[in-house]
């Protein structure tokens, strides 16, 4: 059995077309959804991510503002910029690209963003809303994973889901989203005693640790759905995920590729969150 691919590029195109349609309707009512992206320093990977986000906005009919600052920018200066963007009615979403320079407290900056504009879903108010099932913005990567499961028509009720990784950005919110859909969820991490014993019981596995080959074919139950959030490089310098793709695809029922799986979905859900922030603001 060879797994069916869950094509993140194709699903992203569908969702972005819907974003563009809804953005056009908002514009007719006098509101153009706006995203501000703030980049501090010259981290090469961050520059690529930021360019992709701005490009995606433009292609979907969203207004975007890119603010670039020198790595020497002070924390107080950055907080002042965030405050100004909070009070700018043309901006509906604020994204401060991480990582920030070491002298800036990233959590303090995230908490300075208005929860109404927290389209990354990292604010403690967003985390609390997710925990309690209240309306709020979901972190984009796990949100994208959920959309992929929805796209293949997968019913999570009563299923056993294993999340490998416990970060605040992916692992923890992923577990909560799966739980909200009535899955039984196990979260594994670096201190998990026997990872294979856990994953072999799983109907759904989400790998999100940032380490190659953390999940191999002998660790996967036949027919399981495997979502690969990892972004690594192999020995030839090519992009790869956390999953041994060639091996696992022969066992799994569905699998996401890297690249072309979760990656494009992350940016797409940022657009969805920004659009929804604008719709809420417009009333």
Curated annotation (Swiss-Prot):
Pfam families: THF_DHG_CYH, THF_DHG_CYH_C
Catalytic activity, EC: 1.5.1.5, 3.5.4.9
Catalytic activity annotation: (6R)-5,10-methylene-5,6,7,8-tetrahydrofolate + NADP(+) = (6R)-5,10-methenyltetrahydrofolate + NADPH; (6R)-5,10-methenyltetrahydrofolate + H2O = (6R)-10-formyltetrahydrofolate + H(+)
Keywords in alphabetical order: Amino-acid biosynthesis, Histidine biosynthesis, Hydrolase, Methionine biosynthesis, Multifunctional enzyme, NADP, One-carbon metabolism, Oxidoreductase, Purine biosynthesis
Family, per entry: Belongs to the tetrahydrofolate dehydrogenase/cyclohydrolase family.
Subunit and interaction comment: Homodimer.
Function: Catalyzes the oxidation of 5,10-methylenetetrahydrofolate to 5,10-methenyltetrahydrofolate and then the hydrolysis of 5,10-methenyltetrahydrofolate to 10-formyltetrahydrofolate.
The name this protein goes by in its record: Bifunctional protein FolD
Organism per entry: Paracidovorax citrulli (strain AAC00-1) (Acidovorax citrulli)
